Structure formats: structure tokens, C-alpha cells
Amino acid sequence: MPNTQILAGPQVRLRPPVVEDAEALYARIASDPEVTRYLSWCPHSGVAETRRVITTLFNVGDEQTWLVEVDGQVAGLCARRRPQPYAVELGYCLAPQWWGRGLMSEAVSLMLADLRSDPTVYRVTAYCHADNAGSAGVLRRCGLSLEGRLARYAMFPNISDEPQDVLLFGKAVR
């Protein structure tokens, strides 16, 4: 289902990505090995690949993706998907120039606040690579609790060709 929703906070604005965002997304997010290190996808090979992802993969099926804007600039991405009818899983990434400023915590908090109005959502989860302290901090600041370390749970192709350990965070929202 297409995402048309805009969420806004004091520092960030979340809006659906459009094809015109491809160059900025490629330059700041999709081509940066620092950003993609702990993601499930490899850096894009060019703007054309980013354009293709925007038009074919974002906001398809049960996933909603937002572009994170800071001062009108492309700063990151965040998404949520429904692995089960009653649960939502969150994911996100942010360009390094905006790390350490609480921006992704604000973006995730906006997604969580929006979910509270959905009576069909009972649980929210997110996981991050076990070594990704920054992401774990975002999830803790947003009120998710560490539920455990899952051994060899997810692929991070920019780290290894073998499954890696993750930290699983969760929260009941009703």
C-alpha cells in the first residue's frame, strides 16, 4: 500500500521518498559504506539503482518507508513493516553528518507515536547488529527494551557472508 503519510517533529520531517530524491539518497545514504555497514543491503552501484529501489521496493506490500529530512535536506530513511498482523518491525539509517544529534531517535519516536493510533498493533520490534551501539542507543532512548541477543540471526553483507548476531529490542504498545 503506498505511503502518503507525513510525520513531523521539532527537528525532522518524515515523508514518502520520491524518484527526485534518488541523487541525494545515493550520495548521502545508499553509496556510503559507513551507512550501509550495518544494513541488510550493499551500497548501490549508482543513482540508477537508487532510483529503481525508490520506484519498485519502497512502500510495497506491508512496508512503509519514509525519507528523513533535516532542514529540508535528505538525511536518512526509516521504515516499518508488519511481519505479523499484530506486530510492526522498524528499520532505519542516517547519513553520518547527522549522527549523534538525536535525530533518528526523534524519527523513530514519530513512527512509534503514529503506531499508537492503530488499534491493530500490539507489539513493536527492531533488531540491530550486536556491535552497532549507536542503533541500540536509539532503540533504548525510544523506550524499546533489550529482549535478547540472537545468535547468527541476520545477514549483514557489508560485514560478512555469514549470518551475524543481533540485539533484539521490543515493546508492547497496548
Regions found by a protein language model. Name each.
Residues 1-24, 28-32, 67-174:
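Acyl-donor (CoA/ACP) binding surface of acyl/acetyltransferases
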Residues 34-56:
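Conserved GNAT-fold acetyl-CoA-binding loop/helix
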Residues 35-36, 45, 60, 121, ...:
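Generic macromolecular interface patches on structured domains
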Residues 42, 57-60, 118, 127:
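Histidine kinase transmitter module recognition
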Residues 46-48, 61, 158:
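A short hydrophobic/aromatic micro-motif that marks alpha-helical segments and, especially, helix-coil
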Residues 54-67, 76:
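A short helix-loop-beta-strand connector motif used in the catalytic cores of GNAT acetyltransferases and
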